Amino acid sequence: MAREHQAAILPQPGGPLSVGMRPTPKPGPNDVLIEVKAVALNPCDYYQRDYGMPPVLIYPAVLGSDTAGVVVKLGSNVTTVPGPGSRVIAFASSFYQGGSPDHGAFQTYTLAQSEGVIPLPDSLSFEEGAVFPLAVLTALTAWTTIGMRLDTRYSPVDQQAVLIWGASSSVGSFAVQSAKTLGFTIYATASPEHHDLVKTLGADAVFDYKAGDVVSQIVSAVRRDGVQLHTAHCVVDGALQPTLDILKETKGDAPAKVAHSPVLPEGHPTLDNTQIIFNFPSLDEVARSKHMKEVFHGWLNLSLQTGEIVSSPNIQVENGGLSAVHAALDKLKNGVSGTKIVVAL
């Protein structure tokens, strides 16, 4: 095993990232040491780089969370992860590890807690596998945040519907796919050029979020279909007010629940008899680890085996290894649509 490895290091708040050498860590009892083959980028990565939010606790820092790679070594207590040489998907975030740079994704060797490491199917490339971890965790946490079990299976007789606002984003695409496994009738919003993609992922109807009458369009569709819509996931900023406008017309006297993935601003809009909950995993280590095991070893692993879930959205691969990460984050910050940026290592 290598004594040192390359990492894209954030030396101080504001960056820039630069490639340097770090000592290769040994896995703790519950860790998996992974040789990283591909990393996917998320908006929180450039927020941490540029603004230190979510909080970066230790500098120099290694950012990132989404990886696919090969198992190098298992911690002494790890029994649920395949052994050395196995291809895996891994959630490798330093945020939940006290800022430890040994756990960040943007390096050629990283540690990940075993609850977030599962086999990568042979049918998927490392680049395709890297898109899953944070987006799936966020999408699935939205359901448990509003009190749903991940083994829920509605039937058409139940007539349960959900609204997903921002469905062509990475999180949104997995929100749609997971909603399908839960048995919801799915109403989704996206830019028109992404409607076909969102439908292939499982949405029953997709609407242009920029349309001036999008609220009335969705309300009319819900009434026409005769379903009950009192559940929603706001994946993107700007979604809450139109979501509440729709629920006001569709929920009737039933209580409604909204999972909100962006941070809720002060003074955000509200609706009577409607819970609006910030979507974020528990900060309690025991509860979070249990939830991660349910998400990754339970739901995602099974869904990949059965083919109920696919890699989404479309990936844009950036070559150049770790040296390309900083510029790729700038590209993400400047805006991409219906695309997940992945850097091949």
Swiss-Prot record:
The UniProt transmembrane annotation reads: none
Which GO biological process entries does UniProt record here? terpenoid biosynthetic process
What Gene3D superfamilies does this protein map onto? Answer: Medium-chain alcohol dehydrogenases, catalytic domain (3.90.180.10), NAD(P)-binding Rossmann-like Domain (3.40.50.720)
Give the record's keywords alphabetically.
NADP, Nucleotide-binding, Oxidoreductase
**Does the entry feature the keyword Transport, yes or no?**
no
Enzyme Commission number, as recorded: 1.-.-.-
Q: Where does NADP(+) bind?
A: 44-49, 168-171, 191-194, 209, 244-245
- Reply yes or no: does the keyword Nucleotide-binding apply: yes
Q: State the residue spans of region: Disordered.
A: 1-26
One of the record's GO molecular function terms? oxidoreductase activity, acting on NAD(P)H
Query: InterPro entries per the record?
Result: ADH-like_C, ADH-like_N, GroES-like_sf, NAD(P)-bd_dom_sf, PKS_ER, Trans-enoyl_RdTase-like
Coiled coil located at which positions? none
Q: Which pathway does this polypeptide act in?
A: Secondary metabolite biosynthesis; terpenoid biosynthesis
SS bond partners:
none
**Role played:** Trans-enoyl reductase; part of the gene cluster that mediates the biosynthesis of talaronoid C, a fusicoccane diterpenoid with an unprecedented tricyclic 5/8/6 ring system. The first step in the pathway is performed by the fusicoccadiene synthase tndC that possesses both prenyl transferase and terpene cyclase activity, converting isopentenyl diphosphate and dimethylallyl diphosphate into geranylgeranyl diphosphate (GGDP) and further converting GGDP into talarodiene, a precursor for talaronoid C.
Protein family membership: Belongs to the zinc-containing alcohol dehydrogenase family.
Q: What is this protein called?
A: Trans-enoyl reductase tndF
Lineage, broadest ranks: Eukaryota, Fungi, Dikarya, Ascomycota, Pezizomycotina
The gene is tndF
